[in-house]
UniProtKB/Swiss-Prot annotation:
<dbReference type="InterPro" id="IPR038309">
    <property type="entry name" value="Rsd/AlgQ_sf"/>
</dbReference>
<dbReference type="InterPro" id="IPR023785">
    <property type="entry name" value="Sigma70_reg_Rsd"/>
</dbReference>
<protein>
    <recommendedName>
        <fullName>Regulator of sigma D</fullName>
    </recommendedName>
</protein>
<comment type="function">
    <text>Binds RpoD and negatively regulates RpoD-mediated transcription activation by preventing the interaction between the primary sigma factor RpoD with the catalytic core of the RNA polymerase and with promoter DNA. May be involved in replacement of the RNA polymerase sigma subunit from RpoD to RpoS during the transition from exponential growth to the stationary phase.</text>
</comment>
<comment type="subunit">
    <text>Interacts with RpoD.</text>
</comment>
<comment type="similarity">
    <text>Belongs to the Rsd/AlgQ family.</text>
</comment>
<keyword id="KW-0963">Cytoplasm</keyword>
<keyword id="KW-0805">Transcription regulation</keyword>
<dbReference type="Pfam" id="PF04353">
    <property type="entry name" value="Rsd_AlgQ"/>
</dbReference>
<dbReference type="GO" id="GO:0006355">
    <property type="term" value="P:regulation of DNA-templated transcription"/>
</dbReference>
<dbReference type="GO" id="GO:0005737">
    <property type="term" value="C:cytoplasm"/>
</dbReference>
<dbReference type="InterPro" id="IPR007448">
    <property type="entry name" value="Sigma70_reg_Rsd_AlgQ"/>
</dbReference>
<keyword id="KW-0804">Transcription</keyword>
Amino acid sequence: MLNQLENLAKCVGGNNELIDQWLQARKGLLVAYYHLIGLKPNKEKHTPLDEEALDAFCHQLVDYLSAGHFLVYDSIVPEGESSSTLTYSGLQENTQQIMALYDSHLENAIDHDNYLSFQEALSGVGEALATRFVLEDKLIQQAME
């Protein structure tokens, strides 16, 4: 996902300050996610959960989702543009999906009994973010047309 982000930033970077800031926020979110899941070379298969990394990711996740809905989407795509309506609906559904996982798994304390369901939820968040980034990239492309 970081490679796709870098490619997008090369294509649209410098054309719109808000989009540039948004892409930087996305990069921060991805780095926090990768740190949380322990995506590092030579990592052991079962490493203990880093509570600070979880807190940092959760804060960035909520901030990123909020910024998208309350600042970015309406600012970059003209109101009522029909091609963006479907994309925006998809983003709203995606936000509900991510927040449901957040509410049910990420904001609660993790212990031995719910570790497996937490890992599955974390994977689900990663998949939902990948879907979200595709939708957001469509909005960016529409804004640049």
